[in-house]
Amino acid sequence: MAEQLSLFGSPEPERAPVKPVPAAASAQPKPAPEPVTAYASVVLDIPTRALSEPFAYGIPRSFANEAQIGSTVLVHFGNRAAAGYIVDIAFELGDLQGNSALDPARIKPIEAILSKPLFTAEAARITRWMSREYVATLSECLRLFLPPGGSPRVVKSDDGMWTVERPAVKPIQNRWVMLTPEGFDYTPPKTAVRQRQLIEALQCGPVTTRDLNLLYNSMSATIKALEKRGVVVVEERRAWRGCSEQTTLSSASGKAPVALTNGQQQALAQIERARLDAHGDVVLVDGVTGSGKTEVYLSAIERVLAAGRSACVLVPEISLTAQTVGRFRSRFGETVAVFHSRLSAGERLDQWDMVASGAARVVVGARSALFCPLSDLGLIIIDEEHETSYKQGSSPRYHAREVAAEMARRYRCPLVLGSATPSAEALDRCHRGTYGGVTWTRVEMPERPGHAVLPTVRIADLRREFSHGSRSMFSKPLMEGLERVVERREKAVLLHNRRGFAPFLMCRECGCVPTCNHCSTALTYHERTHTLQCHTCGSSWRVQPYPAPTSRCPKCGSRYLAKMGLGTQQIEDALHQMLPEDVAIIRMDADSTRGKDAHKKLLEQFDAADCAVLLGTQMIAKGLDFPEVTLVGVVNADFALKLPDFRAGERAYDLLEQVAGRAGRGDRPGEVIIQTYLPEDPVIRAVAEHDRSIFTDYDLDQRRDALYPPFVRLVNILAWSANRDDAQDYIGRIAKLLKRRWHAAAPDFLRAGSAVPQVLGPASCVIERAKDRYRFHLLVKSPVGYHVSDDIDACLKEVGSVRGVSVSVDVDAYDLM
């Protein structure tokens, strides 16, 4: 028998079972079909581009009250059964979008209702928009709005029958023990020690049976005895997993300040105007690091909650979640839900259900939190909006900023973007004044609250250090800065955006660099595990560097394999040798934060230390607020500057400016030391002088001349296959179709005063081979405002699918590697 799903994950009350559906049609005569009272558009839960559109099904009279938009249903599709989701309902078949020409007599009925509505009609409309905007299937987009734990699956059993499998993740119930009114007056016998312990434990309120058993080593018999006497009562209540994300971080306090700065007041006033106008306008809060943007968010949310609406807050890094959630919960209590990938499946389900039930009115989390079922959404906030982590890496490859803007327009609520280094796209739209039918407004917050000032930035020219005989990874200014931190018992942050011990090994005899057997990627050496690891596919090989006789060059057999470059592990070792033992050295990168709550524990360790150095990759550069940090050091600022990516400079500037902002956030002044071989680079100069225009003026001129965003929209179409020729041929066919299409339409573009979309390539990717697949891509540059996705979708359908070849479309692409 197949179980049905309820909105909150638990089985519905028992009703007529869903009969297994035969895999093939039966030869026996069929009973007369039940009358159909309406029609539904059903998106099949089969993620293939060939089935990207919804299919029409009839709603039998027996399901008329249960079939709603958002319901999961069981349907026949061809010679199989499938689960699907209702996205539209109409009484006439012709009123369903795209189904006006269908014959009602040929429409199959829905076989069963598998769940109550899991998403709203507005969510279904946003799904359609996402599917068209990002050239993704409807089922892929719909899954974003579904409760965690998986959707129902229809599987074929050994006997040839199709059956429904429900998700394994289920809610749990806690048993709570509490005193009855009579229980407060009950006096246990003198010899009933356990009863006295239980009653004393319950005097301050209900306690779970689990906690009582842990405290007093099994209280089950005592609870039963007092329950029979009417002294206590036991109730089952839904447990909300994921609510215990407590933190000892001092920066997690959400106490409101005595007064807001002028910049904070202006930002809050602009957000309030956008809220009252109710057009879905966008407000960009452009505030220097430490200017108090979070307090603006908290104050804006207070007004939204007072109006009876809800709010969604996105943060870019899991490492920021504990700090942010702590501040929000200290202000708004347990009405705050948290949603990110490090939660267990059960915790995500419970947090989702807290939102769906209305128990939580504020959601804080990563980009996926945007799709939580908040009722009457009144405000969306995206903190550090410039961060690339808001771009989804797999289909549907949406950008949270763009989806949030569409949601804000539909829900008629403001979208607030906050950053000390706003993206070029956000700044350009604010300069235009309008985009996507709504107003974009920029509000500056140029000062820090209180007596805090921006840190002093010093450039350590590594060329000069080398010419003076220094071979250390630390320049003289940085070493002196660390010594001052130790003397004053303060704290420092060191950024190095390369994890591992050394970025690669190199043969000293032939120059060979070992690469991954499955990817065209150099392997990174990890000292702790003595492994070479591929950071593209995750493969690893045990290895011992010279003079170990077991490790040899794969090309010439030499034993002279040298560790080249620096990784965070190697810098950590050097710090331990250089600094006193009583200085805590805490490394924070992808390797040290694999475990659950690892980010929070490391930050709490840093916060609690008397004197400490926090060493890490880019995850330490964003949003962290530690007033005791007086020194920020950048070990090598040049890694990201010369990558083959037009956004390389912007990313480098964002990273350096953000990490510089970790210094001097309290009463003590801050200092930033940036080590570089390129002190004349506009990125380095802009950070050193706290003048963004030095970089942005140069960068925007380069992009305007080369036609890159924000002056065009950029689409990356990627094909990959185990067969190199197949992938290259497939992407070549798409390129020909697009060029032919736009060449024919060129007069229409010119008459409209618009540029013609361009096709660059195809060419092999920078990382040509990954996970044993050869990768080729082409780039499309489209005028802003032209819906290029429709043309790309049409060409993909014309080419069709090719066995063994996969294709992806990345609209507004960020990853071009």
Please give the residue ranges for each predicted region.
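Accessory, non-ATPase domains that flank or precede helicase/AAA+ motor cores in DNA-metabolism machines
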Residues: 1-419, 426, 432-452, 487, ...
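Inter-lobe coupling/hinge segments of SF2-like helicase ATPases
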Residues: 251-261, 265, 269, 279-728, ...
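Short helix-capping segments at alpha-helix termini
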Residues: 332, 579-581, 741-752, 800
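Surface-exposed amphipathic alpha-helical segments in non-transmembrane regions
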Residues: 693-694, 700-701, 738-739, 743-744, ...
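Short amphipathic alpha-helix segments
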Residues: 726-760
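Nucleotide-binding motor/catalytic cores of P-loop/tubulin-like NTPases across gene-expression machines
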Residues: 745, 751-756, 770-774, 786, ...
